[in-house]
Amino acid sequence: MDQHDDFDSVSWRQDPESDISRPTTSGTDADESLEYNRDTNGKRRMSSVHEDPPQAGPLADAVDLAGIGDGVLECRVDSPLKENDGTKDAYISYLVTTHTDFKSFQKPDFAVRRRFTDFYFLYKTLYREYPACAVPPLPEKHKMEYVTGDRFGPEFTSRRAWSLHRFLKRLTLHPVLRRAPLLAIFLESPDWNAHMRLHSTRTSTGNSDGSGTGIFDNFTDTFVNAFTKVHKPDRRFIEVKEKADKLDEDLNHVEKIVARVARRESDLEADYNDLATQFRKLVPLEPDVEVPLQIFAASVEETARGFKMLKDHTDQNYLGSLRDMEAYIVSVKALLKTREQKQLDFEALVDYRNKAVAERDSLAANPSSYYASNPLTSSPASFIRSKMEDMRGVDHEQSRRERVRKLELRIDELTREVESAKTTSEMFDEEVVREVADFERIKAVEFRDTLGALAEKHIDFFQGAINTWERFVAEMEGDLDNDPEMSEHGRGGGVAA
C-alpha cells in the first residue's frame, strides 16, 4: 500500500460553487454512450466508453469522486395511513411519490403506497447486493412505541415518514444506488409484494446452494482480524475515520441541545394555552372589557398554535434528521472497517507466503537442519518430526525434497492469492474513496435542506406572531377610536397619572 501513502486526504467539505453541491440528483439513463462496470465486490460504476474512466487518485477532482451524471429522480414520502384498522393485522402505509425523467420508468410521475417492512426489504437487499456502498440506514424500529401501543400515533408516524423520506432521498442522490433495479421496482411496481416473495425465494435458494461453511469462515476471519492491526495504515482513511468520529460527536451534542429546545417549545405552547384559558376566566368578572379579553386570549392561542407547529417540525423533522445522520455515519464507518479487513486479509496472505518462502530457503541452504537429530541444536518441531520419521523408517533426504516440493506449490498458490487479494483491496480502496465523496455530497444537500426548512419554520412562526399581535393592536386601537367614553377615560387616566 506504499503507493497510496502520498494521496491527498479526502475532504469533508465541498466547494459550494461546484456542481456536486446542487440539490438536484444526478445520474444518466442507460444508453449506447454509457456502460456499467461491476467490480468483484458487486458495486457498479458508470463510465463513458468515449472517455477515460474517472480516477480516484491524487489528481481526481470532486466530480470524479462523486460520480455525478445527468437525470432527475426525486421521491417524497408522506401521508401516513392506517390500513386494516380494527384488525390484528393493522399497519401504517406511506405514500411514495416519484418524479423522474429516467426512460426505464413507464411514466414521469407516479405514486405507490409502501409499509415499513417494504422499506426494510429494500434496505436489506441493497445492503447485500452492494457491499462496497455505504447504504443509507433505515430509522430504528422504536420498539417502545410497539410496547406502549403508540405506533399508530400521529407523532410517531410523522416522525417515521420524515425518516423514510430521507432514506429514499439519500438513495436517489447516490450515483450507484439510484440505478439499482430493485429501487425502480420499489418505486413503481403495483405487484411489489409478489416481487418480494419471488426475490426472497431466489435468495434462499442461492444461499442453500452455497457452501455451508461460508458464514462460519467469514465469522472466523472477522473474529481473527478484530485482534489484528494493519501493518501499513492508509492516511486517507485514518483521516476520514477521525473526522467521522468528530462529526458524530458534534452531532450528538447538537441533538441533545435541539431536544432541549423542542421540550421548551412544548412548554411554551402549554404555558400560552394556559394563559389564554386564564384570561377567558376573567370575562365573567369584567364584562366591560369582554371583547378585548376575548381578542387577547384568541391571540395568545394563535401564538400557542405557532409554537406547536414549530415544536412539531423541530422534534419530528429536524431532530430526526440529526439522528438519521448519526446512523448514516455509522454506515460509513462500517464500510471503512470492511475496507480495513480486506487490507488485513492481504497482509495476512503476505505473511503466510513470506513464512513459506523462509522455510523453503532454510531447507535449501541448510539441509541438515531438517534432520535435527540433536534436540539442543534444533527446534522442537524439527526434532520431533525427525524422530517420527526414524520410527517409520522414512528416508530423511527424500522427505526433505518432498517437503520442498510442497512448499514450492504452496508458495505458488499463496502468490496467486496475494495478487488477487491485493487487487481486491486496492479496488475496494478506490470504491471507498468514491463512497466517502458521495456521502459528503449527500450530507451537504441534506444539511442544507434540513437547516433551510428549520429556518423557514422559524420565519413563518415569527411572521405569524407579528401578524397576530399587529392585528390585535389594530383592533384595540379601532375599538378605542369607536368608543368616545373609553377614549376620554383613557386620556383622563393618563392625565391623572
Swiss-Prot record:
UniProt keywords, alphabetically: Autophagy, Coiled coil, Cytoplasm, Endosome, Lipid-binding, Membrane, Protein transport, Transport
Coiled-coil regions, chain positions: 235-261, 397-432
Subcellular location, record wording: Cytoplasm, Cytosol; Preautophagosomal structure membrane; Endosome membrane
Keyword set includes Transport: yes
Membrane topology, as annotated: Peripheral membrane protein
Chain segments annotated as transmembrane: none
Region described as Disordered: 1-59
Major place of residence: cytoplasm
Domain PX: residue ranges: 72-194
A biological-process GO annotation: reticulophagy
InterPro entries: AH/BAR_dom_sf, PX_dom, PX_dom_sf, Vps5_C
GO molecular function: phosphatidylinositol binding
Biased composition (Basic and acidic residues): 35-53
Any one GO CC term of the record: early endosome
Residues the record lists as binding a 1,2-diacyl-sn-glycero-3-phospho-(1D-myo-inositol-3-phosphate): R115, T117, K141, R160
Description of its domains: The PX domain binds phosphatidylinositol 3-phosphate which is necessary for peripheral membrane localization to the perivacuolar punctate structures.
Record-stated family: Belongs to the sorting nexin family.
Functional summary from the UniProt entry: Sorting nexin, involved in the separation or division of vacuoles throughout the entire life cycle of the cells. Involved in retrieval of late-Golgi SNAREs from post-Golgi endosomes to the trans-Golgi network, for cytoplasm to vacuole transport (Cvt), and autophagy of large cargos including mitophagy, pexophagy and glycophagy.
Name this polypeptide is given: Sorting nexin-4
Organism of derivation: Aspergillus fumigatus (strain ATCC MYA-4609 / CBS 101355 / FGSC A1100 / Af293) (Neosartorya fumigata)
